[in-house]
Amino acid sequence: MLTDEYVKRVYAQVEKRDGDQPEFLQAVREVFESLEPVVAKHPEYEKAGVLERIVEPERVVKFRVAWTDDEGKVQVIRGYRIQFNSAIGPYKGGLRFHPSVNEGVIKFLGFEQILKNSLTSLPMGGGKGGSDFDPKGKSDAEVMRFCQAFMTELCRHIGQFTDVPAGDINVGGREIGYLFGQYKRIRDEYSGVLTGKGLEFGGSLARTEATGYGLCYYTAEAMRVLRNDSFEGKTVVISGSGNVAIFATEKAQALGAKVVTASDSNGYIYDPNGIQLDVVKDIKLGHRGRIKEYAERVPGSEYHEGCKGVWTVPCDIALPCATQNEIDEESAKALVANGCTVVCEGANMPSTPEAIAVYQSNNVLYGPAKAANAGGVAVSGLEMSQNSYRLSWTFEEVDGKLKSIMENIVANSLEAAKEYGHEGDLMLGANAAGFVKVANAMVAQGVL
């Protein structure tokens, strides 16, 4: 519940203006609830109108994308790029291609990105983009033509010192390659305008693994500091089967845990003997198949239709890595009832407010997405650095920097939580630590 008059007033304005964007309202309210002790301690933020400004994007770009499918039919859909806040660096955030994409979804993701990027301590502002294009069932040629059409419009709004997009759901190495090629062709320049590129043309080692590995580094450090515990011997439930889920599984297994689930939009698999990651990689990365194929190939494993059931599997640690609001109150209660004591988020905002309340009332160690999944954008920032210097670091160098960044996020979040009277609260601490850096920059730069 909001109690601070300044916070309540600004949230009411957001609600009135953006009432048709539920994901954005949810993200703003969660952050605002954490920021009440912060704005009470910093009256200069109200004087400078920081809250009013930070919830309003600096620029919203919405554009038509027209492309031709394999049958020669013209398809027309929408593209978006929301350049939310550049107080601490150029806009930075991924591109998502999914039928669920609309302005409200991109807006919530861009808002979260401001604080997430701030937490990495790297000089990156917040932005997000995408389209309601669905690459599933499309040929490589169709995906290429769509990416080229999308970049033809987007290219006039981005640049290595202005806005540096990356991948997100359904935008992986293939799509980034097509987007980069079209940008290079139109602008006639070879620059670090996108991250997540192939190693052959400016990409960074460990970028593919970064979000999943970073999630586990964050979780391990939070468990060590707050619970004097580790992954060793724990049973882990993970949703999703994309890059984040796959590499979270890989790192959790390396840290001594047994991961027993994976899922996609149709259902989930349960393997009591532990997920065979090589099989998942072959299905999902090798030929873009469906996760049910795992149960056909691995004796003793089970496939279940529907995604919610994954949260009924007994576990010690849950790492949601699929999509927003995948864990509701009912699912959170099922996790707690089945022994889960740690939830750290690999997806963006995968827990509803009601689910978070269940975690908090049951002493579950909860790591919010903007902190726990910041590894991807952290290594994107490191890729930008390598592009600027025209050099390439080794996998071990990048991975070491990633681990250090994630451990620092835990430390900075806990320090902020203590400073504002909520010791041990990783969610409030992440929101406060990320916000204060951006707010101070906004105050210093004047009313813009």
Short names for language-model regions:
Residues L2-A27, A222-M223, A334-L448:
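Adenosine-phosphate binding glycine-rich loop
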Residues T162-A166, Y190-L194, I238, T261-D264, ...:
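General beta-strand structural signal in soluble alpha/beta enzymes
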Residues E142, R174-G181, L205, F247-K251, ...:
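Short acidic, glycine/serine/threonine-rich loops at helix termini
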Residues I106-L109, L179, L215-M223, A248, ...:
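Buried hydrophobic packing segments
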